[in-house]
Amino acid sequence: MSFENYFPLWNDLNTAQKKLISDNLITQHVKKGTIIHNGNMDCTGLLLIKSGQLRTYILSNEGREITLYRLFDMDICLLSASCIIRSIQFEVTIEAEKDTDLWIIPAEIYKGIMKDSAPVANYTNELMATRFSDVMWLIEQIMWKSLDKRVASFLLEEASIEGTNELKITHETIANHLGSHREVITRMLRYFQGEGLVKLSRGKITILDSKRLETLQRS
């Protein structure tokens, strides 16, 4: 499918706006592990994912990563165009978790259209509100939910994304997602293994008891 099929506001644009986007649209293929945007880069623009998977995260003062949210096929990333939204005051990094094909609408192009189009402005505000809701939910999890529940939730989410209970993922990667230390995650996973919830092997975690993990995350 083409960009027009992926961009939800295409039919709300006038002919001139459609031409402006088409003339300036950037198509990009990025490899797994590529940093697409970080707080020190210029305003990248609006990202629309054709296929693949991105992770948006922040860095603590100690250099620890914590995932804000992940993006999948047909998702739109606004934080990569933070310069057009004055309310965004924090720096984020966006990384490709898988090989990803995406489109980029340059920030100035999108900003101009947003000023002239009420549907685009409304959609942008709604999407930003959704993302901030995701971030507030994450903060609530960090503050009030114990680490064992957060690890259980992460493993179940990862299994759902990958479509398998055999997860090719390192303890360091989980720590980066959850804003923790690798050693702490390793101890928790070893505890899970002792309880028969998972099986650990080099570079892989196999979920053995999804139902008990679900019970744990809800408790």
Which role fits each region the language model picked out?
Residues M1-K31, L71, I76, A81-I85:
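Cyclic nucleotide-binding regulatory module and flanking cytosolic helices
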Residues G33, T44-Y57, F72-M74:
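Glycine- and acidic-residue-biased ligand/ion/polar-headgroup-sensing regions
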Residues I36-M41:
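Short phosphate-coordinating micro-motif centered on Lys-Gly-acidic
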Residues N61-L68:
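Short alpha-helix-to-loop micro-motif enriched in aromatics/charged/Gly
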Residues Y69-N125:
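Cyclic-nucleotide recognition modules
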Residues E97-K98, K115-S180:
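Polybasic "coupling" helices that flank or enter modular domains
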Residues L147, L156-S219:
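Phosphate-/nucleic-acid-contacting segments
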